[in-house]
Amino acid sequence: MINISFPDGSVKQFAQNITAFEIANAISMSLAKAAMVVEINGEFKDLSTVIEHDCKLRILTAKDYECLEIIRHDAAHLTAAAVKELFPETQVAIGPAIENGYYYDFARDKPFSRDDLATIEAKMQELVKKNEKITRELWDRDKAIEFFLSIGEHYKAKIIASIPAGEQITLYRQGNFIDLCRGPHAPSTGFVKYFKLMKVAGAYWRGNSRNEMLQRIYGTAWATKEQLDNYLFMLEEAEKRDHRKIGKELDLFHFQEEAQGMVFWHDKGWSIYNTIEQYIRKKNRKNGYIEVKTPVLVDKSLWEASGHWAKFRCDMFTLETDDKILALKPMNCPCHVQIFKQGIKSYRDLPLRMSEFGLCHRNEASGALHGLMRVRSLVQDDAHIFCAEEQITDETVRFCKLLTEVYKDFGFTDIKVKFSDRPEIRAGNDEVWDKAEHALKTAVEKVGFIYTLNPGDGAFYGPKLEFVLTDAIGRQWQCGTLQMDFVLPERLDANYIAASGEKKRPVMLHRAILGSLERFIGILIEEYAGKFPIWLAPVQVAIATITNDLNDYALEVQKTLIDNNIRTDINISPDKINYKIREFSNQKIPMIAVIGKKEQANKQVTIRKFGTTGQEILSIEQLIAMIKKENSNYL
């Protein structure tokens, strides 16, 4: 007999060589029917797995979040099986689960059409209804290569050929379809019920542009119909909110081929950019940061000394001049260390909080560029805190509080924290890492954040915190970071005089709240769907006249508002007032000030707020006071 330990703490005895499915069935028939996979001693396995020894066991159903990846992997196989039935001449390549879905790569001469996707999806539904059994098979490597070559699946044969000789190969069979896979998989195709094929795109074999182009079918799959419907609704909403679309509609920015990955900011977009920078600058100043400006172009010798040349050389833009190699900086940290090193620093100077809106350049692949979300030229709300070891916790607490304030001001209150601890390959000894990790954990707990652990995901030079925002339609964005660094101060020979009189290395905390300003503005455009709050809106008040004889008063109102640093637009054309209001509403301007004869006579305006039907009559002084009060909360 063997002892099986369950998650509830119970231990039960079963006959040796029992399968996981038989254990599920012994517990209850309904559990066995719902079971998808099993976790044995922390490793996910098929239900057909034979258990020979004592173990910890957990039976998983579609209700367990871990099964979502299984469902998506099963859906990928289901897609390939459907394609092979419909288009037998097509070769299959690879099909992994990815975030929110899966893809499968195919090789065929004729491109898949939209109609083909609908046909494939219908065939998948047929296979689900058949509830075909999914079985795991162990094959000899060479025989597996021979088999796939015999059925014309050259890509599968190539993948297997890259596996060391002598290794056993795992194949999964469902109906007439067989695929190379490590697994695990559900017992049958009937477990994949809620899916949709999304699109077709090109993809190079093995991700190498020198290889042949394959066709990649993307799909999504979920555990319930509600989850699928919610995801499709989110995608539909995301398409409406696409920052590239709204950016064009609101005349905020554009991109063009002559400067790939570089933003052409228009006046309204640049207004948003500068307002955010002004806001962050004020927050930093209140929290004891100094602001600096460092060169954009720096000799490669500094990047070699910092270690960035060895690690990021391929991602850096370089040029040669006067027998020197210069690089556009991809980050600000080595330059900040140079400022720290100017003059002798004492323990009394710490912590030194140094901020910069530093212009950085990164040579991102053209295929990875995506509007404001992924660019080659970017500015970060970057700062580095030089501190003593004993100051790490307090500085982290201070930063977390500042970050929370900033996110709240932009409307984000759902903040998730990820804590990444020591990787296997790392600098520093365990004692240093123990102190560093304890300091960060203590700080996060003091602020009241609940964090999830990313084991071993820290940088080799220190642990880190990542801060993830959830937007209005449920998407998550990792923006803020706090990264501890023991290595860079040593590499660049930064030190301070301790109270004892000896030289010590400062600890360096790399931190950002927004991350790239370009990306954060993209996130905000989609979060607000272009409807910016009044303090951030590029045009705060739009003035519209009912008749032309009111134009002089309207221009007088505009001048008064501009003199009070209020951003305005005006339409004094002969167009009808309803047309003017509609045009300004399409631009999502927070306030429209309508001027008629009555308003002129009383030195007033009638205010229509965006998204509301009501109106409010205000004096010019009242309007100015209202907007100034709103601005003063942030700027």
Swiss-Prot record:
Bilayer-crossing regions: none
Residues bound to Zn(2+): C333, H384, H510
Subcellular location: Cytoplasm
Gene Ontology biological process terms, A to Z: threonyl-tRNA aminoacylation
GO cellular component: cytoplasm
Xref: Gene3D superfamilies: 3.10.20.30, 3.30.54.20, Anticodon-binding domain, Bira Bifunctional Protein, Domain 2, Threonyl-trna Synthetase, Chain A, domain 2
Function of the protein: Catalyzes the attachment of threonine to tRNA(Thr) in a two-step reaction: L-threonine is first activated by ATP to form Thr-AMP and then transferred to the acceptor end of tRNA(Thr). Also edits incorrectly charged L-seryl-tRNA(Thr).
Molecular function per GO: ATP binding; metal ion binding; threonine-tRNA ligase activity; tRNA binding
Keywords of this entry: Aminoacyl-tRNA synthetase, ATP-binding, Cytoplasm, Ligase, Metal-binding, Nucleotide-binding, Protein biosynthesis, RNA-binding, tRNA-binding, Zinc
Alphabetical list of InterPro entries matching this protein: aa-tRNA-synt_IIb (IPR002314), aa-tRNA-synth_II (IPR006195), aa-tRNA-synth_II/BPL/LPL (IPR045864), Anticodon-bd (IPR004154), Anticodon-bd_dom_sf (IPR036621), Beta-grasp_dom_sf (IPR012675), TGS (IPR004095), TGS-like (IPR012676)
Catalysed reactions, semicolon-separated: tRNA(Thr) + L-threonine + ATP = L-threonyl-tRNA(Thr) + AMP + diphosphate + H(+)
Family the entry assigns: Belongs to the class-II aminoacyl-tRNA synthetase family.
Protein name: Threonine--tRNA ligase
UniProt cofactor(s): Zn(2+)
EC number annotated for this UniProt entry: 6.1.1.3
Renumbered residue ranges of the record's region Catalytic: 242-533
Keyword Aminoacyl-tRNA synthetase part of the UniProt annotation: yes
Subunit structure: Homodimer.
Cofactor notes: Binds 1 zinc ion per subunit.
Keyword Protein transport: no
